[in-house]
Regions:
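C-terminal catalytic/acceptor-binding lobe
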Residues: 145-221
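Aromatic-glycine-rich donor-binding/catalytic loop that engages nucleotide-sugar donors
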Residues: 124-143, 152-163
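Short beta-strand-to-loop acidic/aromatic patch adjacent to the donor-nucleotide binding site
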Residues: 81-92
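Glycine-rich, basic loop-to-helix element that forms the pyrophosphate-binding segment
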Residues: 61-78
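Short, well-formed alpha-helical segments that are part of the catalytic scaffolds
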Residues: 11-25
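Conserved donor-nucleotide/metal-binding helix-loop-beta segment in metal-dependent transferases, i.e.
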Residues: 96-112
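Short beta-strand/loop segment that forms part of the nucleotide-sugar
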Residues: 28-38, 59-61
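A conserved acidic beta->alpha catalytic loop
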Residues: 22, 34-46, 91-92
Length: 221
């Protein structure tokens, strides 16, 4: 049984529902973090394959937390899990492929999908978080938090595996669906890329810290 699946979502709730409907293997906890505060929880009654999901949580945020804080919130809320599947809201499993992906997951390793981008569906084991820490919340609101975490993990010889399980991903659906988000992402993507390069100039960085000014300057709201 998959211990936890965490799905942050900002818009395109139809694609999030597609992701949930693709769950065809037992999951102990499904955590949906609604950063757009626009999803009707009653719709889950018609969407989710409840025969496979033991418990679900829909957390509606008053503003966009961003990717790293959303993943971290899901991890910190389930500290006794053996690991976590972090899934983009616009990715989905082909039939039988959640089980195939989970078979490639271990508590002391990271498992990525062979689809691009590889972090569109990723497993992070509890042993990895114990060694590496959480995702860096310096990156606002999205992009480079996955690169940063993987780089930190590889530097301390954490195994990073690639699963051949069938996972489909509609890349950048969030920003493609809203022209204003695409415009804001141009700036935040550049700033996050510059920060990523800067953080690694002096060796292996720690997880970093959330910063109010950076959040206000680069957030998409």
């Amino acid at each position: 049984m998959v211990p936890v699946i965490i799905i942050p979502v900002l818009n395109r709730y139809d694609l999030m529902e597609r992701a949930i409907r693709s769950i065809d293997y037992p999951v102990e906890r499904l955590i949906i973090i609604d950063n757009g505060d626009g999803y009707d929880p009653d719709m889950l009654a018609w969407t989710a394959p409840w025969q496979h999901i033991q418990n679900w949580y829909l957390w509606r945020m008053p503003t966009n937390l961003g990717v790293a804080p959303s993943w971290n919130l899901g991890i910190k809320s389930t500290p006794h899990a053996d690991g976590w599947i972090l899934m983009n809201s616009y990715a989905f499993f082909e039939p039988g492929q959640l089980e195939a992906f989970y078979k490639d997951c271990e508590s002391d390793s990271i498992t990525l999908t062979s689809a691009m981008p590889t972090w569109s569906c990723a497993w992070v084991g509890a042993g990895v978080v114990e060694r590496v820490g959480l995702f860096s919340e310096c990156y606002v609101p999205a992009y480079f938090e996955d690169n940063d975490f993987e780089d930190r993990a590889r530097r301390i010889n954490v195994e990073v595996k690639v699963s051949q399980a069938g996972i489909i991903h509609d890349n950048s659906s969030t920003i493609r669906s809203d022209e204003s988000l695409a415009d804001k992402n141009q700036r935040s993507f550049q700033e996050n890329g510059s920060l990523h390069a800067l953080r690694w100039q002096s060796g292996v960085p720690d997880a970093g810290a959330w910063d109010l000014k950076r959040r206000r300057d680069l957030g998409w709201d």
